[in-house]
């Protein structure tokens, strides 16, 4: 009897407890919370993890590792995949962890080595067009060289800031790997691929135009070095392109990279020779020719030339990711752009003071014939050795975006199962080399082409997109002065980009109409 009473009391207590828990759970549910037992808590925690991964997968890009066998899951990756299909499987997570751990063993570059790479990008051959920018801009052109250095340094920093986000513990972690990843994150979730495609198109245009400029400058330099020879500038461009055809067979840049240091040293020697010659004529410098006013029609072209000479944002995310100490990135950007600003300003001013209104689009064309031939031969060698770098980068972007996206690719893979380049893939590479030749033949205007490229893609990749992405991704964390800087850069960059593009086109049309040769 006592046992029966005890069991009934226990049942009543249990039912009361269940009802009270149900009421409390209902109350919490109406407030937006959910009560759970210990066993259910594990399930809810797992669901929360999956939900968090899914939401992050909508916003972040996923790196897919493809293997020749065609099995996309054979090699995993701990990063998010590009197509936003959700988190990888547990097997791929384990393999991705192994790949992450193995990546720690890869050699990293120091801040000095990173600075050397940035210096090579912003102190290349295209500084030869800066005196021409001073010709049409005067002192305002000199100010623009300084201003462009400050802005490009700032936009490079904010572009890298877009690679990072704070986790739940308040720690800043790197969640993106490239310029394309940042663009896709800004357009997600509605258009997760749009931003990356825009950036890819801009990169391809800039890289191909860089290749065209190398062919143009090679033909220009050879023609002006040997004017007595019965060979036109177009013929010299064809000869230069014939030497560049082996670039179509490139599988990697190991062979080319061996010449990078030699190219940089040669260019440094050339700059020293030009400045030394200019200093030898310091008594004849035409200070009165440096204008305080600008040529309204041609100054926007100068803006494009100056901006194009500072472009390095394309490879900054990869460079920062390979640094031993990413914290030193800001310091590295500061001293590289300060050095570039000083050297470019001095080179442009000294060269313009020497030749004043006779300054040509490529400043070495103003040198005496004896010195010009030697200097130009070095420059042509540097241009030909520099051509494979942007060419290979453009080929990689084209192959990844058009030929290597699996089922979503527009065209079949240009590589066979054994990794060899197919014949039609080789034909496309040769066609790209020939395209750069045709553009160089029919548009042989170095400064106008450089101004056009700088206004179109240079301003977009260096000014407009970094400031726009910074506002989009980090809006809630930005202070008022950062918002002001970003908006100002975007507005000024848009105005300069449109005006430079329009005036560069007008300059090209005028050159064709009156058959003006460089």
From Swiss-Prot:
Lumenal, vesicle side: 147-197, 280-298, 356-376, 453-454, 504-518
Keyword Transmembrane helix: yes
Disordered: region residues: 66-98
Keywords recorded for this protein, A-Z: Cell projection, Cytoplasmic vesicle, Membrane, Neurotransmitter transport, Synapse, Transmembrane, Transmembrane helix, Transport
Membrane topology field: Multi-pass membrane protein
UniProt-listed InterPro entries: AA_transpt_TM
Cytoplasmic side: 1-125, 219-258, 320-334, 398-431, 476-482
A GO molecular-function annotation: glycine:proton antiporter activity
Chief location bin: membrane
Catalytic activity annotation: 4-aminobutanoate(out) + n H(+)(in) = 4-aminobutanoate(in) + n H(+)(out); glycine(out) + n H(+)(in) = glycine(in) + n H(+)(out); beta-alanine(out) + n H(+)(in) = beta-alanine(in) + n H(+)(out)
Cell location: Cytoplasmic vesicle membrane; Presynapse
Function in brief: Antiporter that exchanges vesicular protons for cytosolic 4-aminobutanoate or to a lesser extend glycine, thus allowing their secretion from nerve terminals. The transport is equally dependent on the chemical and electrical components of the proton gradient. May also transport beta-alanine. Acidification of GABAergic synaptic vesicles is a prerequisite for 4-aminobutanoate uptake.
PANTHER family xrefs: AMINO ACID TRANSPORTER, VESICULAR INHIBITORY AMINO ACID TRANSPORTER
Family named by the database record: Belongs to the amino acid/polyamine transporter 2 family.
Protein name, UniProt field: Vesicular inhibitory amino acid transporter
Organism: Xenopus tropicalis (Western clawed frog)
């Amino acid at each position: 009897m006592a046992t029966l009473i005890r069991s009934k009391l226990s049942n009543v207590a249990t039912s009361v407890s269940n009802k009270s828990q149900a009421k409390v759970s209902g109350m919490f549910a109406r407030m937006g919370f959910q009560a759970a037992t210990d066993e259910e808590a594990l399930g809810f925690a797992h669901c929360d993890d999956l939900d968090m991964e899914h939401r992050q997968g909508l916003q972040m890009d996923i790196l897919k590792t493809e293997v020749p066998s065609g099995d996309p899951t054979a090699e995993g990756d701990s990063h998010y995949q590009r197509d936003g299909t959700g988190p990888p499987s547990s097997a791929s997570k384990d393999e991705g962890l192994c790949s992450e751990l193995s990546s720690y063993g890869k050699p990293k570059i120091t801040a000095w080595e990173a600075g050397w790479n940035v210096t090579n990008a912003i102190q290349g051959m295209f500084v030869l067009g800066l005196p021409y920018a001073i010709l049409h801009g005067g002192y305002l052109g000199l100010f623009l060289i300084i201003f462009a250095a400050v802005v490009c340094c700032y936009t490079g920093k904010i572009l890298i800031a877009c690679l990072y986000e704070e986790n739940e513990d308040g720690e800043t972690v790197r969640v993106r790997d490239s310029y394309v990843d940042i663009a896709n994150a800004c357009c997600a979730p509605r258009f997760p691929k749009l931003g990356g495609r825009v950036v890819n198109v801009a990169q391809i245009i800039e890289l191909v135009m860089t290749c065209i400029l190398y062919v143009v400058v090679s033909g220009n330099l050879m023609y002006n070095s040997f004017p007595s020879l019965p060979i036109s500038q177009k013929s010299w461009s064809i000869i230069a392109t014939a030497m560049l055809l082996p670039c179509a067979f490139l599988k990697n840049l190991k062979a080319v990279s061996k010449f990078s240091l030699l190219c940089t040293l040669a260019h440094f020697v050339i700059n020293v020779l030009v400045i030394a010659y200019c200093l030898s004529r310091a008594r004849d410098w035409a200070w009165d020719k440096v204008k305080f006013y600008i040529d309204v029609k041609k100054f926007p072209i100068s803006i494009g030339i100056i901006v194009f000479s500072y472009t390095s944002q394309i490879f900054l995310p990869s460079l920062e990711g390979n640094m031993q100490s990413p914290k030193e990135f800001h310091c590295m950007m500061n001293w590289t752009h300060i050095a570039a600003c000083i050297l470019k300003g001095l080179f442009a001013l000294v060269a313009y003071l020497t030749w004043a209104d006779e300054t040509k689009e490529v400043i070495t064309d103003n040198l005496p014939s004896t010195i010009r031939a030697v200097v130009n031969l070095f420059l042509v060698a540097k241009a030909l050795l520099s051509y494979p770098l942007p060419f290979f980068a453009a080929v990689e972007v084209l192959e990844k975006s058009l030929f290597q996206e699996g089922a979503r690719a527009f065209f079949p893979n240009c590589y066979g199962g054994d990794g060899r380049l197919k014949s039609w893939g080789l034909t496309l590479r040769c066609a790209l080399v020939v395209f750069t030749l045709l553009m160089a033949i029919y548009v042989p205007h170095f400064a106008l082409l450089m101004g056009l490229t700088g206004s179109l893609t240079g301003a977009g990749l260096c000014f407009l997109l970094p400031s726009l992405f910074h506002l989009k991704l980090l809006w809630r964390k930005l202070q008022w002065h950062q918002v002001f800087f970003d908006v100002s850069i975007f507005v000024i960059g848009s105005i300069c980009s449109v005006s430079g593009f329009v005036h560069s086109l007008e300059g090209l049309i005028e050159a064709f109409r009156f058959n003006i040769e460089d």
